[in-house]
UniProtKB/Swiss-Prot annotation:
UniProt-listed Gene3D superfamilies: Aspartate Aminotransferase, domain 1, Type I PLP-dependent aspartate aminotransferase-like (Major domain)
Binding site for (6S)-5,6,7,8-tetrahydrofolate: L118, G122, H123, L124, E242
Name this protein carries in UniProt: Serine hydroxymethyltransferase
Enzyme Commission number, as recorded: 2.1.2.1
Chain's role: Catalyzes the reversible interconversion of serine and glycine with tetrahydrofolate (THF) serving as the one-carbon carrier. This reaction serves as the major source of one-carbon groups required for the biosynthesis of purines, thymidylate, methionine, and other important biomolecules. Also exhibits THF-independent aldolase activity toward beta-hydroxyamino acids, producing glycine and aldehydes, via a retro-aldol mechanism.
Assembly behavior: Homodimer.
Entry's localization field: Cytoplasm
Pathway note: One-carbon metabolism; tetrahydrofolate interconversion; Amino-acid biosynthesis; glycine biosynthesis; glycine from L-serine: step 1/1
Recorded superkingdom: Bacteria
Cofactor(s) the protein requires to work: pyridoxal 5'-phosphate
Main subcellular localisation: cytoplasm
Record lineage: Bacteria, Pseudomonadati, Aquificota, Aquificia, Aquificales
Length: 422
C-alpha cells in the first residue's frame, strides 16, 4: 500500500509510520478525535484528488466532472437522509468555513450575534474576540449557570431581549449535556433572530439517535465530518431550502474555490456508514462508555463538571487533586493516554494552564471498547494524576494501556504496510 511513498520519500513515510504506531499504542481520549474506517481513507486517497470541480454537481466550470458529480450527489443525498434536512452543501473544507459561510450569507459586518462563551464550553467560531466571528460581528456571549453548570437559558433569553441579535448560535466544543434546541428556537423567534446550530461534536450521536436532532429547529445547522461522525476532516452545512442559494454562493465562489473531491468522496462513504444499524449501536455505546468513565472517575474522587454527561465527552475538574490541566495532559501522555487540557467553567487559571481536562470516548468506542474497559482506563487516569512525578507508577499505567490497546487493534490489515511491529 505504501511502497511508493516508502521509496520516494522515506522521511515522510517514517513520520507516518511513527504516527501509525502512536495511534495503535495510545488511548485517544481527545473528544474531537476519532478513527475513520479503511474505506473512508481509501476514498480520500483515491484518484479524485486529481480533479478540479468548481461549482455544484451538474453545474461545473470544468469539463470531465461526470463521475465526481455522482460522488457529490451521493454525499448530499446521504447527508440529507441522515439528519432529515431539506438542503445540504458538502463542500466546506472545515467546520470553521461552514460557520463563516452561514454568518456572511445572512449578516452584515457589525450585526449582533449571540453565542456561547469559549471559556464556558463554546467554540472560537461562535463569536470569540480572537476569531473573525468576534471581529467582524458584534459578539454577545452567554454562559453556564454557576450552580448547575448547565446552559443558562434565562441568561440567553435576557441577552437576546437586550441586544436583539440577528443570529443566535447554539452548539459547543466542551459541553457534555443535552442542548435544548427547542428552547433556543423559542428565544430566537421571540426576538426575530435566525438560529444556527453547530452540531460538530454531537453529529454522530445525533445520526445514531442518542442525542437530539437540531435540524427541525434551526434555519442553519453546521458540522464537521470527523469527531463522532467518523468521517474525514471537513465541514458541511444543512439548511432550509429557502436559504440554499445564499449558502451555495458563499461557499463558492465567495469563500472557497474548487471543492476537495477526494474528501467529499470520503464524506459520502462516512455518511453511508452512519446510516447503518451498526452505527446506531456504535453511538449508543459511545454514550454508555462516557457515562461509565464519568461514574468511575467520580467514584475515585474526581469532580465531573455538571455531575456527568449525556454525550461522548466530559470535563474533569482537577482541583480536588491540586493538579493543573497542563500537568495532567503531560503526565497522562507519558502513560500513553492522550487528552487535552481544558478550561472548566469559571476557571481561575490561564487557558495555557487550566484547572481541567476534557475526555472523550468516541475513538475508544471505535476500537471496540466497552464499559469495563472505561473503568479500567479511569483507574489508570486517577493513578497517574495522583502520582504525576512517579515514573514507576506512570510506567505501570503505560504497560496496562499497551496491553489494553493490543486487545483492540485499530488497523491490523495495515501493520505490514506501516512497518508496525518490525
Amino acid at each position: 500500500m505504501l511502497n511508493h511513498l516508502k521509496n520516494v520519500d522515506p522521511e515522510v513515510y517514517s513520520a507516518i509510520s511513527k504516527e501509525f504506531k502512536r495511534q495503535e499504542e495510545h488511548l485517544e481520549m481527545i473528544a474531537s478525535e476519532n478513527y475513520t474506517s479503511q474505506a473512508v481513507m481509501e476514498a480520500q486517497g483515491s484518484v479524485l484528488t486529481n480533479k478540479y470541480a468548481e461549482g455544484l454537481p451538474h453545474k461545473r466550470y470544468y469539463g470531465g466532472c461526470e463521475y465526481v458529480d455522482i460522488v457529490e450527489d451521493l454525499a448530499i443525498e446521504r447527508l440529507k437522509k441522515l439528519f432529515g434536512a431539506e438542503y445540504a452543501n458538502v463542500q466546506p473544507h472545515s467546520g470553521s468555513q461552514a460557520n463563516q459561510a452561514v454568518f456572511f450569507s445572512q449578516l452584515q459586518p457589525g450585526d449582533t450575534i449571540l453565542g456561547m462563551r469559549l471559556d464556558h464550553g463554546g467554540h472560537l467560531t461562535h463569536g470569540a474576540k480572537v476569531n473573525v466571528s468576534g471581529i467582524v460581528f458584534n459578539s454577545v456571549q452567554y454562559g453556564l449557570n454557576p450552580q448547575t453548570e448547565l446552559i443558562d437559558y434565562d441568561e440567553v433569553y435576557r441577552l437576546a431581549k437586550e441586544y436583539k441579535p440577528k443570529m443566535i448560535v447554539a452548539g459547543a466544543s466542551a459541553y457534555s449535556r443535552v442542548i435544548d434546541f427547542a428552547k433556543f428556537r423559542e428565544i430566537a423567534d421571540e426576538v426575530g433572530a435566525l438560529l444556527m446550530v453547530d452540531m460538530a461534536h454531537y453529529a454522530g450521536l445525533i445520526a445514531g439517535g442518542v442525542y437530539p436532532n437540531p435540524v427541525p429547529y434551526a434555519q442553519f445547522v453546521t458540522s464537521t465530518t470527523h469527531k463522532t461522525l467518523r468521517g474525514p476532516r471537513g465541514g458541511v452545512i444543512l439548511c432550509k431550502s429557502e436559504y440554499a442559494k445564499d449558502i451555495d454562493k458563499w461557499v463558492f465562489p465567495r469563500l472557497q474555490g474548487g471543492p476537495l473531491m477526494h474528501v467529499i468522496a470520503a464524506k459520502a462513504v462516512a455518511f453511508g456508514e452512519a446510516l447503518t444499524e451498526d452505527f446506531k449501536k456504535y453511538a449508543e455505546q459511545v454514550v454508555k462508555n462516557a457515562r461509565a468513565l464519568a461514574e468511575e472517575l467520580m467514584a475515585e474522587g474526581l469532580r465531573i463538571v455538571s455531575g456527568g454527561t449525556d454525550s461522548h465527552m466530559m470535563l474533569v475538574d482537577l482541583r480536588p487533586l491540586n493538579v493543573k490541566g497542563n500537568q495532567a495532559e503531560e503526565a497522562l501522555g507519558k502513560a500513553n493516554i492522550t487528552v487535552n487540557k481544558n478550561a472548566i467553567p469559571f476557571d481561575p487559571e490561564k487557558p495555557t494552564v487550566t484547572s481541567g481536562i476534557r475526555l472523550g470516548t468516541a475513538a475508544l468506542t471505535t476500537r471496540g471498547m466497552k464499559e469495563n474497559d472505561m473503568r479500567r482506563i479511569a483507574k489508570n487516569i486517577v493513578k497517574v494524576l495522583k502520582n504525576l512525578d512517579n515514573e514507576k507508577v506512570i510506567q505501570e499505567a503505560r504497560d496496562d494501556v499497551l496491553s489494553l490497546c493490543s486487545s483492540y487493534p485499530l488497523y491490523p490489515d495495515w501493520f505490514k504496510d506501516y512497518g508496525y511491529g518490525e
